[in-house]
Amino acid sequence: MIHGIGTDIVHIARIRTSLERHGERFAERILAESEREAWRASRDPARFLAKRFAAKEAFGKALGTGVAVPATLHAVAVDHDALGKPLYRYGDGLQTYLDDRRLNAHLSLTDENDYVVAFAVIETR
């Protein structure tokens, strides 16, 4: 059964401006520790951050908490499976929260020119 859905759109230029203004400190506010190495190696750091931010916003909307405890920016990470499909990873507290409620999340990400869109679905297992 569907617990919730969430979507978010991010203008990459907005992220690029913040990144230029605040540097790595801005990225550290958005990224979980596990995402930071991939961000540093990214060919387009602003696009990378925009995707992560949109994915986390969509997750919070689908969960119904917004980007707040337990679904903070650092508690939610975006990764990819062996085929490149995006997926969520969680900090211990959020993983426990989801397990206790038997919730499972799915993520779709797309980007085109100036925008990134994320769509999240959370279902009951």
Swiss-Prot record:
Its main location: cytoplasm. It catalyses: apo-[ACP] + CoA = holo-[ACP] + adenosine 3',5'-bisphosphate + H(+). One of its GO terms (biological process) is fatty acid biosynthetic process. The keyword Signal does not apply. It is an enzyme of class 2 (transferase). One of its GO terms (molecular function) is magnesium ion binding. It comes from the Bacteria. It holds the Pfam family ACPS. One of its GO terms (cellular component) is cytoplasm. Mg(2+) binds at D8, E57. It is found in: Cytoplasm. Keywords: Cytoplasm, Fatty acid biosynthesis, Fatty acid metabolism, Lipid biosynthesis, Lipid metabolism, Magnesium, Metal-binding, Transferase. Its EC number is 2.7.8.7. InterPro entries: 4-PPantetheinyl_Trfase_dom, 4-PPantetheinyl_Trfase_dom_sf, ACPS, Ppantetheine-prot_Trfase_dom. Its cofactor is Mg(2+). The keyword Oxidoreductase does not apply. Signal peptide: none annotated. Transfers the 4'-phosphopantetheine moiety from coenzyme A to a Ser of acyl-carrier-protein. Belongs to the P-Pant transferase superfamily. AcpS family. This is Holo-[acyl-carrier-protein] synthase.
